[in-house]
Amino acid sequence: MSPVANAFDIKSASLDLLALLLRTDNLDELSQALDARFGDTSDAPAEAFVLDVEALPNPTELDLGRLLPLLSRRGIRAVALRHPDNALAAVASRYGLAFANSAAQPRSAQAAAEPAPKAAVESAAAPASAPTMIIDRPVRAGQQIYAKGGDLVVLAMVSAGAEVIADGNIHVYAPLRGRALAGARGNHAARIFARSMEAELVSIAGVYRTIEQALPDSILGKPTQIYLENERLVMTALGE
């Protein structure tokens, strides 16, 4: 067999990607919301996202030509478009995106599980968790650390302009001056712990607060924990 015949193989692959669910096609409004949450992270490594447009009333009117560069400047690299209508596959292809039909994804399994909610809860009660990621060096401006599927522990300072993300909890045993996003895949029980709270932005399961809202003196520069309560961020000094 010639060497050319062994040049590559085709195998099945499963990628676990974050999805950006758009709730508006107003790009000015979306740009403001993205700035509030991410700022300009064009120097940071881009994170691959699936662009979910199922919630838009007229997804074909979405200006992807403007949207994709807008997302890229925030460190969001759209790799696929998701919607139940196959007609959008041509739109996705026009902009170099893959197309994922959300109607073809296994939702029937969820419906079948509804008559037996106890079994569903029990099976979901003990998900396989990834090992805790430990970072023992400073996270500098423009850097992004992501602990996929687990907790993140940072033993040094998170500088302004840096971003730490975890699907679980985030522990920063030094000043937290950048952005911290815990529960990135929707874990409402996730928490953020910081030795010195000075963050530009904190977020848990998509609920966020930016530096534009001044931190109260009770936690500014002090050991702090952050958690969700009734869909609102609660920030309290540790030990209180």
From Swiss-Prot:
The keyword tRNA-binding does not apply. InterPro entries: CAP/MinC_C, MinC, MinC_C_sf, MinC_N, Septum_form_inhib_MinC_C. Keywords: Cell cycle, Cell division, Septation. Coiled coil: none annotated. It holds the Pfam family MinC_C. Belongs to the MinC family. HAMAP family: MinC. This is Probable septum site-determining protein MinC. It comes from Chromobacterium violaceum (strain ATCC 12472 / DSM 30191 / JCM 1249 / CCUG 213 / NBRC 12614 / NCIMB 9131 / NCTC 9757 / MK). The lineage of its organism: Bacteria, Pseudomonadati, Pseudomonadota, Betaproteobacteria, Neisseriales.
